[in-house]
Curated annotation (Swiss-Prot):
One of its GO terms (cellular component) is cytoplasm. It comes from the Bacteria. It catalyses: 5-aminomethyl-2-thiouridine(34) in tRNA + S-adenosyl-L-methionine = 5-methylaminomethyl-2-thiouridine(34) in tRNA + S-adenosyl-L-homocysteine + H(+). The lineage of its organism: Bacteria, Pseudomonadati, Pseudomonadota, Betaproteobacteria, Burkholderiales. Residues 1-232 are annotated as: tRNA (mnm(5)s(2)U34)-methyltransferase. Residues 255-637 are annotated as: FAD-dependent cmnm(5)s(2)U34 oxidoreductase. Keywords: Cytoplasm, FAD, Flavoprotein, Methyltransferase, Multifunctional enzyme, Oxidoreductase, S-adenosyl-L-methionine, Transferase, tRNA processing. The gene is mnmC. This is tRNA 5-methylaminomethyl-2-thiouridine biosynthesis bifunctional protein MnmC. InterPro entries: FAD-dep_OxRdtase, FAD/NAD-bd_sf, MnmC-like_methylTransf, SAM-dependent_MTases_sf, tRNA_MAMT_biosynth_bifunc_MnmC, tRNA_MNMC2, tRNA_S-uridine_synth_MnmC_C. It comes from Polaromonas naphthalenivorans (strain CJ2).
Length: 637
């Protein structure tokens, strides 16, 4: 449930927000806008401090109603000398509703357009890290839902500015104690500026104890003083606390022009890199990413496993990209997806059940399917099924094309890489005859199951190879005949194979079902037995839809598509720097969840490369490191 807020009449458009939990107002009598500008922006020397910088990172303790973020975003947009990238990281233990966030901004008309954009993305805020994207990926809001001390325990970034906000120290002492400030200090570099509205002695003493040099400065009437300072500890900062050096944008070779490679290329290009994408095929998305249409839906599990949590982060990232780059109802559609739990009734986490604390936020993601939704599928009301709200279908190839069209990205087909040679601080990608295809300071291996061989070329001293396994899949599809469309639901269904019922193609309206799953097979040939396998699965998944398509399957009118996926034993992607190979990274192993993970992994790679805030928790990101994809040797290798 969202945090309860009371709105006190004060003569303004929205009223004054008040927290019953803490018995305190969300903003001072000055108004939130003036406090944000005078206390936080001015207190941290913004916008002057970020002028001409490639990126800037603000850390805030206490997101509240988002006013400080909105004011900072507006200042960034109005500044001709703004940094290319603005990161805003904010912690919040008790997130407010999207409606209350918008209502809070109504008092300030200049902020309403920003608040409306923010409101559209404030959904599904379960505990953990949520990345919200604005301005075409140039303004990145990382919301850390949970206790500030816990969320900042393992920092992955260095803040340039810190806003210390929250209810008064008397009302909410935990966010102002020395343990919180130690967590904040772990995210700071020498010279990081901090600002806050409180000058309480306990706050000043705790900050000083954590390495901050602070001073009182004149406030805006009726506030007499504010507090400003810098992180200047008298001791040497331990190396274990120093985040990776922010790598300057340069040249990058991405090997592979599927979902993984094209997503990486676009993310790096947004940060100023010149990216060359090489692929052995003559067209982009020629491999597993060439599926006519794929289902985008989160994974759920009773214990809310690592895979489940990562899948939600991936879905959010992909929805943002699809909405920004693709044509709705032509290239993709956020229809929602019904999961028919054929083999067993998939259980939701106990904390998601109705009446529990997380029920509202979880319901933005997944909830039990309704009898009406089941009826549309031709299934009985007793059928075990889930409804994924934030889900739909996408044409992967169209997304690949959009990413490869990003400024700064150059794609080259018929460019099979046979050798990677490092000379004079750069990598050369060579073809089979030894001709140079491209050279760059950074290489990203995103060639599906081909990434394993490339990793062995780049790092011949590696102990064990990446356990990337080839998995052949065959999907079946066809154009709707008279009467078949009416027999199908308006949304995709998955759970035992999948069906995307309505995909607009140049030839007409199509359906797509599948797919088969065969390990260690890379054959591109279509096989009749796989077509029948897909039909058999569809009969179980959606009997009514299968019945409507029987004539097409029996008369040979069904078409086929085949591709080779790449997976790891953990079913998680392999993402990160390759061991024993300087400036070679891996982004592969997404299996059948390329649509789920491609956008997230690309942003995670870019964040780790530049020392930026991560779009997921650090321990989740670490679970994807390539060394963990060497633990099991794939069969048949």
């Amino acid at each position: 449930m969202s945090e309860r807020i009371e709105w006190l009449e004060d003569g303004t458009a929205g009223g004054s927000p008040y927290s019953p939990r803490f018995g305190d107002r969300y903003r001072s009598e000055l108004g939130g806008l003036e406090q944000a500008r005078e206390v936080f922006l001015k207190g941290c020397g913004l916008p002057n401090a970020w002028a001409g910088q490639p990126q800037w990172c603000v850390l805030e303790t206490g997101f509240g109603l988002g006013l400080n973020f909105l004011v900072t975003w507006a200042a960034w947009k109005a500044d001709p000398l703004r940094p290319r990238l603005l990161h805003f990281v904010s912690t919040e233990a008790y997130p407010a509703s999207a409606d209350d966030v918008l209502r809070s901004a109504l008092t300030h008309p200049e902020l309403i357009p920003f608040a409306e954009q923010l409101k559209r993305q404030l959904w599904g805020l379960l505990p953990g890290v949520h990345r919200l994207v604005f301005e075409g990926g140039q303004v990145l809001l990382t919301l850390c839902i949970g206790d500030t001390k816990a969320m900042l325990r393992e920092p992955s970034f260095e803040a340039d500015s810190v806003y210390l906000d929250g209810f008064s120290p008397q009302r909410n002492p935990d966010i102002w104690d020395v343990h919180t400030f130690k967590a904040v200090a772990r995210c700071c570099r020498r010279g990081t500026r901090i600002a806050t509205w409180t000058i309480a002695r306990s706050v000043r003493d705790a900050l000083a104890q954590c390495g901050f040099v602070v001073k009182k400065v004149p406030g805006t009437p009726p506030k007499r003083d504010n507090l400003q300072g810098e992180y200047q500890p008298a001791w040497e900062v331990k190396k274990s606390r120093i985040t990776p050096e922010r790598k300057a944008p340069a040249r990058c070779i991405v090997i592979g022009a599927g979902l993984a490679g094209s997503a990486v290329a676009a993310s790096l290009a947004r940060r100023g890199w010149q990216v060359t994408v090489l692929d052995a095929a003559s067209t982009p998305a020629a491999g597993a990413s060439g599926l006519p249409a794929g289902v985008l839906a989160p994974h759920v599990s009773p214990d809310d496993s690592l895979l489940s949590r990562l899948s939600r982060s991936g879905i959010r990232a992909m929805l943002q990209q699809a909405d920004a780059l693709l044509q709705t109802n032509i290239d993709w559609s956020p229809t929602g997806v019904l999961e028919h739990c054929v083999e067993h009734a998939r259980q939701l986490p106990a904390a998601w059940h109705p009446g529990q604390a997380l029920a509202d936020a979880a319901g933005d993601w997944t909830r039990p399917a309704t009898s009406e939704q089941l009826k549309h599928c031709g299934l009985s009301p007793e059928t075990p099924a889930l409804w994924h709200v934030q889900a739909g279908w996408i044409k992967p190839a169209r997304l690949v094309q959009a990413w490869l069209s990003s400024p700064g990205v150059s794609w080259h087909g018929n460019a099979a890489v046979s050798q990677l040679v490092r000379q004079a601080g750069a990598w050369q990608a060579l073809d089979a005859t030894g001709n140079e295809l491209a050279s760059a300071e950074l290489v990203v291996l995103a060639a599906g199951h081909g990434s394993r061989a490339l990793s062995e070329i780049a790092s011949p001293q590696a102990g064990r190879p990446l356990a990337l396994q080839a998995i052949r899949g065959q999907a079946s599809w066809g154009l709707h005949a008279p009467g078949t469309e009416q027999a199908m639901p308006a949304f995709p269904v998955n759970g035992h194979g999948s069906l995307v019922p309505r995909v607009p193609l140049e030839q007409g309206l199509a359906w797509v079902t599948g797919s088969s799953f065969e390990r260690d097979n890379t054959s591109p040939q279509l096989r009749p037995e796989d077509e029948q396998h897909n039909f058999g699965k569809l009969k179980t998944l959606l009997p009514a839809a299968a019945q409507a398509l029987t004539a097409q399957f029996e008369s040979g009118q069904v078409r086929g598509w085949t591709g080779v996926r790449c997976a790891t034993p953990s079913r998680l992607p392999a993402l990160g720097p390759l061991e024993n190979a300087q400036d070679v990274w891996v982004c592969s192993g997404m299996g059948s969840r390329g649509l789920t993970f491609a956008a997230l992994c690309a942003e995670l790679l870019a964040a780790r490369l530049h020392g930026e805030p991560l779009p997921v928790e650090l321990r989740q990101a670490d679970a994807l490191l390539p060394q963990y994809a060497t633990r099991l040797q794939p069969s048949g290798s």
